[in-house]
Structures are given as C-alpha cells and as structure tokens.
C-alpha cells in the first residue's frame, strides 16, 4: 500500500479563543510541544461530541454544544485530518491553572500511566510557532488564521 492509500484518521478538536484573540493550548506530556485539545472519536460519535469529550477529558473544561462553530475538516498530516470547532470564551472563563487532564496513557519511559496533557496556557497567535507542533503551527499559518478566526467569532 502506498503512503497516500492508507486510510486517514480524523481527530476532532476545539480551538478556544479568548476576548483578546489568544488561543488556549495544552502541553502534551513527555513532548516539547503544545496542542489544542483534540482526539479521535468513538464509533458512531458525532464530531462535535468527540471534540467536546476530548476537551473535557484533556482539560476538565465543559462547554455547551450550541457554543461551537463548526470549522470543518482540515488536512493535518499525511495520515491525519482534523475536524475542528471554535469557541470564544469570556475573559476569565477559563483559568489554565484550574485545568486538569483525566485521560491517561502509558509513559514511554517506564510504562506508568500519565496524563495526556500536563500544563495549560493562553498564547498570542504570533507565538504559536514557539509552542505548537510543526503540523499545528502550519495549519494556523496556512489554512486557519487565528487572527481571522477571532474576527469571525467576534463579528468584527
């Protein structure tokens, strides 16, 4: 099977922006990069439901489905697409210091169960390259401008 013939997986995620246009990122444990809360859906699970479930599992943040703006599906890596949703939150609505991850995976070092995400932050769009994975930074740079998304969410 050629590389392009392999089935593409789809992760569903939520791009959270605050009133200032900063994006909410979560640090992927045992890596150097930060990410948006996202993950694969369960069989039969709608993309919005998968995105909200992953958000809750990876951050402890619960949002109402009606708040989500469906941004659609984006090519992310050679083997994966992202189905993304966006939401704007009010100032102070999400405190990164209060977030917690309940989704665990085995550590590459010793096999002990550790949280998928271990830290949280608000980041201005100009600093995305310093924090996000190359794939996510490229997506925000080429296909989904955070500045334009902020304008869209605020109606500006």
Mark where each language-model region is.
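Conserved N-terminal beta-strand and adjoining loop/helix that marks the start
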Residues: 1-23, 43
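A generic structural signal for short hydrophobic patches within well-formed alpha-helices
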Residues: 41, 128-129
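A short coil-to-beta-strand element that immediately follows conserved catalytic motifs
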Residues: 62-71, 95
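Short, P/G- and charge-enriched loop/turn segments at secondary-structure junctions
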Residues: 1-4, 71, 106-111
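Short hydrophobic/aromatic beta-strand or adjacent loop that forms the aromatic wall/cage
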Residues: 9-13, 80-84, 117
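Conserved Nudix-box catalytic region and its N-terminal flanking loop in Nudix hydrolases
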Residues: 18-61
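Residue-level detector of high-confidence beta-strand sites
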Residues: 26, 71-73
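Active-site-adjacent beta-strand/loop module that shapes the phosphate/pyrophosphate-binding cleft
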Residues: 74-109, 121-126, 139-149
């Amino acid at each position: 099977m050629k590389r392009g013939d392999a089935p593409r997986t789809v992760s569903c995620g939520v791009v959270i922006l605050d009133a200032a246009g900063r994006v909410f990122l979560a640090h992927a444990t045992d890596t150097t990069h930060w990410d948006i809360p996202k993950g694969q859906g369960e069989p039969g699970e709608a993309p919005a439901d998968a995105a909200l479930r992953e958000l809750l599992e990876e951050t402890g943040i619960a949002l109402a489905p009606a708040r989500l703006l469906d941004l659609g599906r984006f090519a992310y890596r050679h083997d994966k697409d992202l189905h993304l949703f966006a939401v704007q939150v009010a100032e102070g609505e999400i405190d990164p210091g209060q977030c917690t991850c309940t989704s665990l995976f085995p550590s590459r070092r010793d096999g002990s169960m550790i949280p998928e995400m271990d830290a949280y932050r608000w980041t201005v769009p100009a600093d995305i390259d310093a924090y996000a994975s190359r794939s996510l930074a490229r997506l925000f740079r080429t296909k989904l401008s955070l500045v334009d998304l902020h304008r869209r969410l605020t109606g500006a």
